[in-house]
Amino acid sequence: KEVATWVKPHFERMGIEHETLFNIKEVDPENKVVRSEEGTESPYDLLIAIPPHRGMEVVEQNGMGDGGWIPTDRFKLTMNGHDNVYVVGDTTNLPVSKTGSAAHFEAEVIADNIASTIKIGAPVREYDGKVYCFIETGHDSATYAMFNYQNPPDLKEPNKPMHWFKTSYNKMYWTSVRGLL
């Protein structure tokens, strides 16, 4: 809700029509119409839609979790009932976005807990639901959303330095994961 409230005046200023709480049932690309589960339809010029997230079929086939998601302790990041099995990223059933940043912050907690379990026999950190998301707003401007289980997104006014930070961060990230930095 916080993001939708924040984005509405920005979209209006840029002449972008949007609709929230619209669950896509089907897209008719020939007539450029999208129909909802709720029985409404909307014409479009450019449709930007996020497909439903789906869990892994192998998880469901092996009885590890409903819908393909592994039941995960939201703080320990372990499979429910198995404290020696860590779960990260898109495989979890956590109430956080399935994004690279969420997986990154989860992985940091898991790595520290594996190391501390080896060294002192117990995990030392809990995951707080932290997610960081850049939001490009056009015209070389950007902002970000950072939130966790306790704090909703607190979006700032878009600005050019944030756009360039995002651009630089992406280049640095991919350079580092390829081992070039």
Model-found features: residue ranges?
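Hydrophobic residues embedded in beta-strands of well-ordered beta-sheets
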Residues: 32-34, 86, 142
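C-terminal auxiliary extensions adjacent to catalytic cores
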Residues: 144-181
